[in-house]
């Protein structure tokens, strides 16, 4: 038995049961840790190769402003698709439940006695009712949030917005030599491997097949903590009129923004995550970035695109560890994609994420104002 296999076999039964319940892939794990140990995976291996250019002005499609005739046309197109049963929503409600004092973010109260998840689901449900349709809604959980979010989902389901959960997978953090990280108590450190799990987890759960059988053709993805990314029929209309497999909302960058951005790689327009840009590339040459709100044709999630695993550094109790993640936006490297430029703030604002309690306190007034304007509060 190899040392690696021996390490896994030595895990306690409770940990092994949790890993198995949430789809831990032992073979992939062993391959990745071997690649890390042998130097085949790591920081410099994450960098893109080939020609890399900022997007041109013509690469971005601007969402028309509210009250314009063009926006109204897109809204009608989106509502027609909702009414026809073609649209479902997926809200990312996973993660590690560490930034709000151990409380699952979806269950944190934001405004008017309502939580992040309440407000997300109320928005989707109201949009479904206005369109005269039904929007099946999925919540992607993690091992850390699944129990709590599933309880909330069961209580929140309605005929116009039935709610169901499925979970992303789980893995173990490593040290640079590929060995399993353990803290001072000797405990291993589990993590959820990012939103890149979406295509695989939604298929593995059977939820994607259920959507297809129900006649759904497009899936609207957003983060539970970005309440400005409301379920807007005009965005759906823009996706349909763009006639691309994927639509990604992008917004103007502000100081401190981190994440992916639109770029052309060997001529192909796609989203590139920040850590994938070579150090020689000036990321400030790209004025927009990915807001993590996307629309997919179901075929995009059914495709067999091979998404890469990336070694990402994290700090756990002061120790530097490695975890492997996939990126859902890497699908844009394989499939035709529309970059939809949306407003960040103001009446049309669509990007107000909340990562921790301090950010919630500072952003709450602006979030409440926006939600009132959109009649969600």
Regions found by a protein language model. Give the residues of each.
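Long, compositionally biased intrinsically disordered regions
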Residues: 314-315, 331-377
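Short secondary-structure junctions and interdomain/linker hinges
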Residues: 26, 39, 43, 131, ...
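Generic amphipathic alpha-helical segments used as scaffolds and interaction surfaces in large
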Residues: 19, 23, 136, 315, ...
């Amino acid at each position: 038995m190899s040392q690696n296999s021996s390490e896994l076999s030595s895990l306690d039964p409770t940990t092994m049961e949790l890993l198995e319940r949430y789809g831990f892939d032992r073979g992939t794990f062993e391959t990745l840790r071997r690649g890390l140990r042998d130097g085949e995976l790591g920081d410099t291996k994450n960098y893109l190769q080939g020609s890399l250019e900022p997007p041109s002005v013509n690469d971005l499609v601007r969402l028309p402003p509210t009250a314009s005739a063009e926006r109204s046309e897109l809204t009608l197109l989106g509502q027609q698709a909702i009414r026809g049963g073609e649209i479902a929503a997926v809200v990312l409600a996973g993660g590690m439940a560490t930034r709000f004092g151990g409380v699952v973010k979806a269950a944190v109260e934001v405004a008017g006695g309502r939580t992040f998840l309440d407000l997300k689901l109320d928005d989707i449900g109201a949009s479904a009712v206005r369109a005269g349709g039904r929007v099946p809604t999925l919540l992607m959980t993690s091992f850390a949030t699944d129990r709590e979010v599933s309880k909330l989902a069961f209580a929140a389901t309605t005929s116009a917005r039935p709610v169901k959960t499925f979970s992303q997978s789980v893995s173990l953090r490593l040290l640079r030599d590929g060995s399993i990280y353990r803290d001072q108590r000797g405990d291993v450190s589990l993590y959820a491997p990012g939103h890149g799990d979406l295509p695989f987890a939604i298929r593995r759960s059977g939820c994607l097949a259920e959507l297809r059988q129900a006649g759904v053709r497009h899936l609207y993805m957003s983060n539970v903590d970005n309440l400005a990314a409301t379920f807007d029929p005009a965005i759906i209309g823009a996706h349909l009129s763009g006639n691309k497999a994927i639509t990604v909302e992008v917004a103007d960058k502000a100081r401190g923004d981190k994440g992916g951005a639109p770029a052309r790689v060997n001529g192909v327009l796609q989203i590139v995550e920040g850590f994938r840009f070579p150090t020689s590339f000036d990321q400030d040459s790209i004025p927009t970035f990915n807001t993590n709100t996307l629309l997919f044709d179901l075929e995009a999630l059914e495709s067999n695109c091979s998404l890469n695993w990336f070694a990402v550094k994290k700090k756990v109790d002061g120790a530097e560890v490695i975890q492997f993640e996939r990126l859902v936006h890497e699908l844009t490297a394989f499939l035709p994609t529309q970059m939809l430029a949306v407003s960040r703030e103001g009446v049309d604002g669509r990007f107000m994420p909340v990562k921790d309690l301090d950010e919630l306190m500072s952003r709450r007034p602006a979030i409440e104002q926006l939600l009132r304007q959109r009649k969600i509060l």
